[in-house]
């Protein structure tokens, strides 16, 4: 096989079990993630390919969703590599805690390690760089509409790219000085961090610090663990919670660059391009 930026060349006699006609397997941390990424594909098509608005029924995206978080995602990805049967696109959160963070979370590390070890011809990976996780890709207007009313909406006047949109800003993340300084400087409220500073001086290690702060409320609250499900109109989740609204996710098809921050624009374009390239298919006309 030969892989370049745009074309994958496959030698049939070497990979006789490979099925290029079947749908791409899209591997994410949760099944709801790939449902959200469909909208990024439509955004990319409207903004960069056709450069016009169209109905979501004009064409289709077809894929088989897979999920795995932490170490599990590496095992699932390796399984896809070993089978050599399908195309597989894997998209992972960076889990970066601040803008200067050069590290990745466990899930992203597993994806990177597996891809570097096997360099598969049938798989492509993408790890977000400009935001912490998928919830940071949700446009502000949807967080304001569906997020927990107790969440810290003031973050939208700042940079929410690395804010934990689900839980909020917790003391547990502020042990490391660079993360603490990042949020202290951004929020501009030294009084907010007095407890953190006092407890950190009393603790010798992060393990001790984590024990002391266990159970404490976030300094700034997030918008709920169900935020993404509410935004995309996850039928199973919403039915269980009796919050199902049939047209809940229709507005996601109408996102424009003006609805997004610069960081979101870059990620929506990158992920949208991959979803468009790897999952776009002909619309059934029967």
What do these predicted ranges mean?
Residues 107-227:
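Activity-critical C-terminal alpha-helical subdomain
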